[in-house]
């Protein structure tokens, strides 16, 4: 439901109200959401567990009361129901087996760092290290297996670099643990934007 949060007077006669708009996707209307551990096409499988927990925490902060049941990995769940792919029949079977009304699945990928070299004139050379990362997520209902929502995020992050010139060598690399947390937080923030309310200002005469 749309709600007026507050008002600010301006210009003598007119004033403006801050209006809250509901999320695009209201997860609290779903009895129980089952979540599959995020897949990791390439890299450390622990990244998937981290992404899954961050996703759940972000959604439940945005919509307190959302009921989530962790189901395990997609491979484990499909094996339990004797299916090969997450198709409508498999989603229906998951619903019956686990008692969930919707299934949220996703993937996260952090590529291998890549190095670039930039030559500034004849006196300086800068080497940079960057990494590409992406996240995808989808929500299906288990009644007929229809897709209710999907979204994703991707980006490139700078890990650091070194500059060499006639003045010497300088630079450094970012702390890997802090950079990983930064990347995961940003991917989750963008991917879950449809689960958060938005706000706008409206003139009230």
Feature annotation, model-predicted:
Residues 86-88, 123, 173:
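Short alpha-helix boundary/capping motifs
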């Amino acid at each position: 439901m749309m709600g007026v949060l507050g008002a600010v007077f301006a210009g003598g006669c007119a004033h403006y109200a801050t209006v809250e708009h509901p999320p695009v996707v209201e997860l609290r209307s779903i009895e129980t959401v089952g979540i599959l551990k995020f897949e990791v096409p390439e890299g450390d499988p622990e990244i998937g567990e981290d992404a899954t927990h961050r996703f759940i925490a972000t959604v439940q902060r945005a919509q307190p009361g959302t009921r989530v049941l962790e189901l395990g990995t997609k491979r484990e769940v499909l094996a339990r129901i004797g299916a090969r792919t997450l198709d409508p029949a498999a989603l229906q079977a998951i619903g019956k087996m686990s008692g969930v009304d919707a299934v949220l699945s996703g993937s996260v990928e952090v590529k291998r760092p890549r190095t670039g070299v930039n030559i500034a004139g004849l006196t300086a050379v800068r080497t940079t290290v960057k990494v590409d990362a992406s996240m995808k997520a989808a929500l299906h209902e288990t009644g007929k297996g229809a897709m209710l929502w999907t979204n994703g995020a991707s980006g490139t992050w700078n890990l650091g670099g070194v500059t060499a010139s006639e003045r010497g060598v300088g630079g450094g690399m970012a702390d890997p643990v802090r950079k990983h947390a930064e990347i995961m937080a940003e991917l989750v923030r963008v991917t879950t934007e449809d689960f958060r309310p938005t706000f706008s200002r409206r003139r009230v005469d």
